[in-house]
Amino acid sequence: MSLVRTRFAPSPTGYLHIGGARTALFNWLFARKMGGTFILRIEDTDNARNTEEATRAIFTGMEWLGLDWDEGPMKGGDCGPYFQSQRNDIYDAYFKKLQDAGRVYEDEGAWRFRFDRSKPVTFHDLICGNITIDYRDASNTPDMAIRRADGSYIFHFVNVVDDIEMKMTHVIRGEDHIMNTPKHIQLFEAFGVTPPVFAHMPLILNQDGSKMSKRDVGAALGTYPEEGFLPEGVMNFLALLGWSPKDDTEIFSPQELIGRFSLEAVNHSAAKFDITKCRWVNQQHIIALPAEEFALRARPFCLKAGLPDSPILDAAIATVQTKVQTLAEVPDKIRFFFDLGMDPEAVSKVQPEALELLFKLADRLEQEPEWDGHELIGVLKAFAKENGVKMGAVMFPARVALTGLSGGPDLSSVFSLLGREETVRRIRSFSLD
C-alpha cells in the first residue's frame, strides 16, 4: 500500500468552524496513525469572499489545536503551491486534457464536464459503506460546470486536480459532500486516475437536532482559546463528535487518540454538539495537568483580569485546579485572595449568632503558636466542639468572612495563603450589614 496522504482544504471565507476543525482533526489523526502525510491546502478561488484574516485564522486555529501539517503554507513541499489561487497553470493544463478528450463543452461562456452516463456510479465509503448514484438520466443530473465564463475554475474541478497532483490516498470530509463524490469520481476517471478512498463523516447537529450554524454557541474555534479551553481538551471533545472507542473511555491525550483512532469506528449517525460535555472534557484535562503547568496556563487570564502579579498568585491558582472547567474561570475564583468582596447571597446565609463565634474564633487563631493550614482545620474542629456547635456552624461563616463566597478553595489553603494577620483581620471585620 502506498504511503497514506490526507488533506484539510478549507476556504478562507470566514472563521474556522468547529466542523472544519473536526475535519482537520480526523485527517490529522488518520495520517499520524498510519505514519502518513497530512497536507494543508487553501482553497482560495472565491476572490469575492476570501480574506487574509480568515486565512490567518485557519493557521492560528490549527496551530493552537496542535494539528501540525507536513506540507502546505509555511512548510512547503513537493506538490506546491498550496494556495489554489497560485495553481492556475496546472488547472489550465488539466482542462486542456479534457478538451482534447472531448469531455467538456461550452455553455453560454462557461464550460461543462460531460458525464459518462453509461452506468451508475458506485463507490465504497469507509464510514457509510457502498453508495450508488445513478447518473444515466441527464434531467436529474445535468452536466456540471467546471469553468466560469470569466475563466476561473469551479470547486469540483480544482479539488480533483489538486487531489491528483498532491497524490491523495484518502479524502475524509463531511457527509454533505457525498453527493459531490460521484462527480469527482467521474473526473478522476476522465483523467485516467484511480480515485482515492473516501470517508464521509456524520454531520454535527445542535442538541435540538438542527444543523449547527456559524452563529451557534461553540461554533467558532477562535473563541475557545479566549474562553480558557485547553487545546488538548478541545481536541479530545472534537474526536468524540462522531468517533468513539470500543469501550467507555472518554478522556484521551493527543497521543492516545492517535493510537486508538480508526475510520471504521466513526459513527454513521449525526453527532450532537454539547457545550456542557465540552466543558466537562476540558475540566478533566485541567485536573490532569501538573500544578506548575496549570498555573502557567492560568496566569495570563489572571493578569488580564487585573489580578496582581503577586508572590502568592501561582499558589492561589493551584487552589482551584479541581474546581474550574476553563482557565477563564480562575480569576473570579481566586480574586478574594487579593481583593475581598462580599457575595450578598452568601452573607445572607450566615446566621446572626455566628458573629459571636467568629469573634471568638479570631481570638483563638491569633493565639495559635504555629500557622499551618491543615493543622488549623483541626483547630476549627476543636473550637466547634468546645462551643457545642457542629463543624458547619464554624466553617461556613469563616469561609464567607475570609472569601466573601459560599464555596471555593479548601479553607486550609485559604488560611495558609492569607496568613495569620490577614485571616484574623478579615474575620474581625466581617459583619452582616
From Swiss-Prot:
UniProt short sequence motif 'KMSKS' region, positions renumbered to this chain: 211-215
Presence of the UniProt keyword Aminoacyl-tRNA synthetase in the record: yes
Pfam families, per database record: Anticodon_2, tRNA-synt_1c
Positions contributing to ATP binding: K214
Keywords: Aminoacyl-tRNA synthetase, ATP-binding, Cytoplasm, Ligase, Nucleotide-binding, Protein biosynthesis
Catalytic activity: tRNA(Glu) + L-glutamate + ATP = L-glutamyl-tRNA(Glu) + AMP + diphosphate
Cellular location(s): Cytoplasm
Motif segment ('HIGH' region): 10-20
EC number: 6.1.1.17
Protein family: Belongs to the class-I aminoacyl-tRNA synthetase family. Glutamate--tRNA ligase type 1 subfamily.
Quaternary organization: Monomer.
Protein name listed in UniProt: Glutamate--tRNA ligase
